[in-house]
């Protein structure tokens, strides 16, 4: 499920960081399919508990409880990535240079896009909160860097995911991340949108 995917992602980050210099980028869209895997698993658990306790639950109640537990799992998974990156030191004693890419249009369908939006929302909320240092004080972590892509679905106040853009702006005001990329401008300049933290310094593809 989603938690397992997040754990594996952090292990990959650690392995790559220990065997190379320079940065690495991950896209939250790669984690999005695992949200539905967890949803289905949690739903089965809720139905089994309902039967075991002999409590009749409506479809609406089952769906509501499933989504609540799912949200908790997404929150834990995002926290795992944040804290692992913050506490991880590479073999040369540095924190890994990790960039997290938030791009709704990488989702393969509408359900996956909604699930990706849930991960992005949680990532931004946790970054706004910050992380606790050794003294228990909430601080701004240096990594992972965040990049948020502006697109038709989130750029105007009547677009379905505009609330994420507002949350991103709030996060930038407090934590100086994320950075922003325009899907439209990037496609015009480069022909595609790249998951890279050094976007405008990379050579054009041949």
Question: What residues fall within each predicted segment?
Answer:
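Catalytic cofactor-binding cores of redox enzymes
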Residues: 1-197
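Conserved small/polar residues in nucleotide/adenosyl-binding loops
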Residues: 200-205
């Amino acid at each position: 499920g989603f938690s397992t995917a997040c754990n594996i992602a952090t292990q990959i980050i650690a392995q790559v960081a220990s065997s190379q210099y320079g940065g690495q980028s991950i896209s939250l869209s790669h984690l999005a399919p695992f949200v539905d895997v967890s949803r289905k698993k949690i739903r089965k658990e809720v139905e089994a508990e309902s039967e075991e306790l002999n409590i009749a639950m409506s479809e609406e109640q089952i769906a509501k409880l499933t989504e609540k537990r799912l949200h908790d799992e997404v929150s834990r998974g995002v926290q795992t990535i944040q804290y692992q990156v913050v506490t991880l030191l590479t073999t040369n004693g540095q924190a890994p240079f990790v960039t997290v890419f938030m791009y709704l249009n990488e989702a393969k369908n509408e359900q996956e896009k909604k699930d990706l939006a849930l991960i992005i929302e949680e990532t931004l909320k946790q970054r706004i909160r910050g992380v606790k240092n050794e003294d228990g004080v909430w601080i701004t972590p240096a990594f992972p860097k965040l990049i948020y892509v502006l697109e038709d679905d989130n750029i105007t106040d009547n677009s379905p995911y505009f609330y994420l853009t507002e949350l991103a702006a709030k996060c930038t005001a407090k934590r100086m991340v994320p950075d922003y990329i325009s899907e439209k401008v990037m496609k015009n300049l480069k022909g595609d949108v790249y998951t890279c933290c050094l976007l405008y310094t990379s050579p054009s593809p041949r």
